[in-house]
């Protein structure tokens, strides 16, 4: 049963020196530490799923480039096209650019937009973005692959789709009452 109290991350506070992102993170240990979207997303996914904060429940996510995470299905995580709290948003680049991007879903708004937490290789240490459905693209050149679900937060798209539809219905109902 998922914990009902997801704690979103909207600032970098608590990241520097945190073992999820540093000493216990395979990207950091391989020389690809922060700022780096894969290092950040891997660490945040683990931080979200490690309910006892004892560094157990180590993820089996890909340790390759961001655009490879979606196809790394041997990790055993459910995947889908519906956003979920704590899920990894997977994007691939176009044919002539970079290595994709991964981010973590921190909030799902009633209108379907999501807020993601991010880091960028050679760029920003930490930042958030608000992205719109249906493809949740932060910039031109990216292609939406989908979401990898964190099992601690429900584990599958069906659960999250029901929650999202309920929130959407409630938001619509509130708007009707206001008018």
Positions of predicted regions on the chain:
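Secreted/periplasmic proteins that engage bacterial cell-wall peptidoglycan
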Residues: 1-120
């Amino acid at each position: 049963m998922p914990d009902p109290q997801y704690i979103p991350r909207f600032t970098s506070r608590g990241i520097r020196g945190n073992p999820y992102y540093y000493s216990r993170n395979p990207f950091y240990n391989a020389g690809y530490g922060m700022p780096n979207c894969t290092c950040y997303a891997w660490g945040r996914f683990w931080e979200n799923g490690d309910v006892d904060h004892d560094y157990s429940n180590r993820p089996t996510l890909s340790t390759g480039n961001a655009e490879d995470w979606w196809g790394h299905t041997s990790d055993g995580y459910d995947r889908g096209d519906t956003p979920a709290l704590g899920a990894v948003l997977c994007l691939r680049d176009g044919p002539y650019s970079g290595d994709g991007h991964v981010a973590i879903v921190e909030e799902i708004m009633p209108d379907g937009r999501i807020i993601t937490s991010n880091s960028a290789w050679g760029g920003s240490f930490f930042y958030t973005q608000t992205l719109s459905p249906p493809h949740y693209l932060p910039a031109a050149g990216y292609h939406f692959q989908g979401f990898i679900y964190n099992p601690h937060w429900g584990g599958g798209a069906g659960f999250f789709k029901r929650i999202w539809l309920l929130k959407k219905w409630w938001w619509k109902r509130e708007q009707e009452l206001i008018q």
